[in-house]
Amino acid sequence: FFPEDALKLTELAKKNNVTAIVDCGVAPGMSNLILGYHNEKMKIDSFECMVGGLPKKRTQPFEYKAPFSPIDVLEEYTRPARYVENSCIVTKTALSDAEFIDFNKVGTLESFNTDGLRSILFTMGHIPNMKEKTLRYPGHIDLMKSLIKAGFLNTEAIQYKGQSISPLGFTSALLFDQWKLGATEAEFT
């Protein structure tokens, strides 16, 4: 993730004869490609992407493994979530609008708002309703809200024993090994 609007970098990339491929993971990325494919085939009035990489083996307390940098996951929980409702961009708090959803062979997962639409907010702006929700095992939202409330995801540095540390950086460092998906650990997306 980077905070800049990738579409605003188009002219800079052209000027430097560079091809930049952004938002090209699972979501955003594969979800954008699937939406683009169907957009060519039919009129779309509503698009909802539900995504979450989860470990098959659930381990307390987080029951989560990050297939990418933990700091990016944690920032996803603090960055306002944008989606489209009735052709207007709406902004809500991340982790909001929680719902429980049942999946065959997986069980119940919780879903919540995250800011994953990114570039398709603009490239697919003709679709009147679009939303992305992240999926986690039940209880994850409450754990993350506790970390937020306690200040563990703050970006402003604090002083500890004469050292300046970032609570978010510190938390990410602690979670790095706990959230690392091992080479033989199974996960599903």
Please place each PLM-identified region on the residue numbering.
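Short gly/pro/ser/thr-enriched loop/turn and capping motifs at secondary-structure boundaries
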Residues: F2-L7, A27-M30, G53-R58
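C-terminal catalytic/substrate-binding lobe primarily of soluble NAD(P)-dependent oxidoreductases
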Residues: K41-T189
